[in-house]
Each structure stands twice: as C-alpha cells, then as structure tokens.
Amino acid sequence: DDMGYGDCSINNPESKILTPNIDQLAKMGVRFTDAHSAAAVCTPSRYGLLSGTCPARTDINNFTAGRGPVIDPDEITIADLLKEQGYATHMIGKWHLGFEGGRAFDFSKPLTGGPLDCGFDSYFGVNKAPSSPPYFYIRDREPVAKPEGSIDGNEGKGMDRREIYRKGEAAPGFKPEEITEVMCHEAVKVIRDYGESDKKQPFFLYYALTSPHSPWLPSEKFKGKSEAGNYGDFIVQLDDEVGRVAKALKETGLEKDTL
C-alpha cells in the first residue's frame, strides 16, 4: 500500500532497500514493467482490483474515510466469481471499502457491507490504514475488541513525519506498530490450516497489507536494515513477511499448486 515501483530491488538495482523475497516471487512469475493503476490511492485501487471496474468510470475516484460500502450489493467481485467455482474465499488485511454506517460504527450489531458481504467467507483485518482512529481489528463481522480505550498518537517530525498516527479511540492493547506482524500471522495460519488438513476444496486468499502506508513503524529488529530510513526499514519488514507467506506455501506443499 503506497509502495513505489523503484522500491523493490528487482526493479531498481541502485535501490537502498533489498527485497529478496519479493524479487524471488518476480523471478518465479511474470513481472510487468509498464503497468498502470487506474487510481493511485487506497479506496479506488482496491475497488478496481476486487470488482474489475475502472474506478474512473464511477464516483469512486479518491480515498474514503467515512462513507459507507462502495461496492454495491449487486456488483460481482473476484471473490464472488471464485466462490461460484467452488473456492473457499478468505481476506486478511486492509479493507478500506467501507462498512454500513460509515464512520459511525454501531458495535451493538454485526458490521455489514464489508468483505463477508462481497464474496468472502472469512475476514480478519482493519477498516483502513492505521493512521487515524478508530483503531481496532475486525474478524468476520465483529470487532475483536471494541475501541473503548484510546491512544495518544504520534505527531511525527521532519523526515520522520510519516510516523504519524492520530490520537483517538482504540481497542485495548492495540498497537499500530504491530499491525503488519499480526496480519502476517493470520495469513500464514490460513495457509497452514489448509496445507496441514485433508481439505480438498481450493481456496483464494486476498492478503492486503497495510504497509508501507504511513505510519512508518518498523519493528525493532528491522530498524537500520536498509539505507533508506524508517520507510526503507518498513519495506524490509514487509519483504520478510512476504517471505514468511511464501515459506508457508512451500512447507505445506501448496507452492506447486498455487497461482
């Protein structure tokens, strides 16, 4: 999310950020060197990816922080299509396509209008980027914990201004710097649950990372791993998480049966 074309070392031999796991994926598959997004920000790019509709042909042409669901109930998503073909469909990560009620979450009832209403069988993730409240994880249609507490936020200064996350409501124990690690754990769990069971049903996993969208908050063990400051270190962490997902596919024997 917000990653630049030249941030991957395979696209930029002079990059100060090494991304061996992403590079390996590129070497094993197809690399598009002249591909263009119909929209360069959060909501429309995700809308186009899931619906197949060019966002410029709709009113979904900018990011949305407070509107309701942007995917209409009668729209067909890639998850819907695969479900019709017998796939189990799972999503992990950043949704940012709205829930019923927009900004006004009503936690007295299930959260509707999200992934489970757009073709996915299961969901774990966050409503949007971890730069503004409310901060909480969602599993299927329920908050893992309601945002009944708060965090102070981080102003960010100078070259580190993209460390910023705003003060506001947060679920108990929610830490913005842990989001990518939590998401990776959930994605690997989905893969291992299939690979280590006798399930014969094919599955689709949409793994929508929040990083390297701000706030740039690499874990301690990744700090200083690049020559491009916190942003570069954050991408090194992202690359490591891509490697962990690839490793799970390999260790479960699913790598050879994966598109």
Regions found by a protein language model. Give the residues of each.
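Formylglycine-dependent sulfatase
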Residues: D2-L259
